[in-house]
Amino acid sequence: MHGLKQLLIFTDGSCLGNPGPGGYGVVMKYKAHVKELSGGFALTTNNRMELLAPIMALEALKEPCQIILTSDSQYMRQGITQWIHGWKKRGWLTAAKEPVKNVDLWQRLDAATSTHKIDWRWVKGHAGHIENERCDTLAREAAEAGPSEVDTGYQAKG
């Protein structure tokens, strides 16, 4: 893994109501370069946006990288570093033999991580962490902008 570009990625998701309009925010740093990504959906959940943020960041990369990825989502971090191994062994079922929630995004995140070396970090949200606060703002603004895009993987309980 020597010679890989070293990136810092910060991610956050937001949802106005849960479910409701949602958004994701990403700050990517490589040397002196900073890139921001964000997007919104008409109806989604907070957890889906927390998963979509790192997916969008990783899918934007054009080559394998060494990454420190920081999020305030324990759900996303624990899922990708711990729970996913059991889910995959059980054919995407939980230990209780229930289908994994948000499986479409977990599978996408799993695929997006495959070519990178990633150190997953957690930071407390709303605690003054500059990049996390910026991601929070990007995600919230995307959710508040009246997004019309449909989160096709979101299934409303009906």
From Swiss-Prot:
GO terms for cellular component: cytoplasm. One of its GO terms (biological process) is DNA replication, removal of RNA primer. This is Ribonuclease H. Binds 1 Mg(2+) ion per subunit. May bind a second metal ion at a regulatory site, or after substrate binding. Monomer. The keyword Metal-binding applies. Endonuclease that specifically degrades the RNA of RNA-DNA hybrids. Belongs to the RNase H family. The keyword Calcium does not apply. CDD domains: RNase_HI_prokaryote_like. Gene3D superfamilies: Ribonuclease H-like superfamily/Ribonuclease H. Residues 3-144 form the RNase H type-1 domain. Mg(2+) 2 binds at D12, D136. It comes from Shewanella loihica (strain ATCC BAA-1088 / PV-4). Mg(2+) 1 binds at D12, E50, D72.
